[in-house]
């Protein structure tokens, strides 16, 4: 039975193989192009050198003979180039048939379309190492990720604990303020009731004072009436007393 790390490494190895094949094909195509260009340059240099040596006209030749020699040299040069171009085209056809006969999975187009740039970097790094190193790297990466998650979890837990402590402190201060506010409200209500009672007493006293004033005024009026009546009755009594001795 294969472990999870081995099952993760196998598709990476397959993709790396396809990538290596694509790189080899690209390198072989570049080498063939370079080889063709190099051969063409060499053929051109050799032909020009051979024609210069074989068909160099004599100094005493006439102009008509010189033209004929030039035409012969050009014809032989063209024939030589045609034969070499046929050979080169045959070689190119053979290379193209070899690339076409390969499987579609080996073509660079499918490989480049199936593999992303990030995977290419990972595969290039993995190609320098053997499978045991890859497995160890995968395990180390998983361990690093686990340690990072643990660190993140610890940091989040500490932050949550600190926030809970702060909220508990705020709640305690809020409760103390609430209790003091309620006490102040009770005292204010008590004082307000006392003030209302005092106002009622004050109003009652004012009413009593008014009643007393009214009674006092009535008493004063009665006294005055009595005085006035006594004044009217006293002269009559005196006149009677004077008349009595004469009789």
Swiss-Prot record:
It is found in: Cytoplasm; Nucleus. Its main location: cytoplasm. Keywords: Cytoplasm, Nucleus. It comes from the Eukaryota. Residues 129-146 have a biased composition (Polar residues). The keyword Nucleus applies. Residues 95-146, 226-247 are annotated as: Disordered. This is Protein ATC1/LIC4. It comes from Debaryomyces hansenii (strain ATCC 36239 / CBS 767 / BCRC 21394 / JCM 1990 / NBRC 0083 / IGC 2968) (Yeast). The gene is ATC1.
């Amino acid at each position: 039975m294969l472990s999870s790390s081995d099952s993760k490494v196998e598709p990476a190895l397959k993709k790396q193989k396809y990538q290596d094949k694509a790189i080899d094909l690209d390198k072989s195509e570049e080498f063939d192009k370079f080889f063709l260009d190099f051969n063409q340059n060499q053929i051109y240099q050799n032909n020009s050198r051979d024609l210069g040596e074989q068909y160099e006209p004599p100094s005493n030749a006439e102009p008509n003979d010189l033209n004929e020699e030039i035409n012969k040299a050009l014809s032989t040069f063209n024939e030589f180039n045609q034969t070499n171009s046929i050979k080169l085209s045959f070689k190119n056809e053979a290379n193209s048939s070899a690339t076409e006969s390969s499987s579609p999975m080996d073509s660079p187009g499918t490989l480049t379309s199936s593999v992303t740039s990030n995977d290419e970097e990972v595969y290039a790094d993995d190609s320098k190492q053997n499978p045991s190193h890859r497995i160890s790297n995968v395990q180390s990466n998983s361990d690093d990720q686990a340690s990072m998650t643990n660190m993140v979890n610890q940091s989040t837990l500490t932050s949550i604990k600190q926030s809970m402590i702060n909220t508990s402190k705020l709640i305690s201060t809020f409760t103390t303020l609430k209790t003091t506010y309620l006490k102040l409200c009770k005292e204010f209500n008590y004082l307000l009731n006392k003030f209302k009672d005092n106002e009622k007493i004050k109003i009652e006293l004012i009413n009593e004072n008014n009643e007393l004033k009214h009674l006092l005024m009535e008493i004063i009026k009665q006294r005055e009436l009595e005085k006035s009546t006594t004044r009217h009755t006293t002269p009559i009594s005196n006149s009677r007393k004077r008349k009595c001795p004469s009789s």
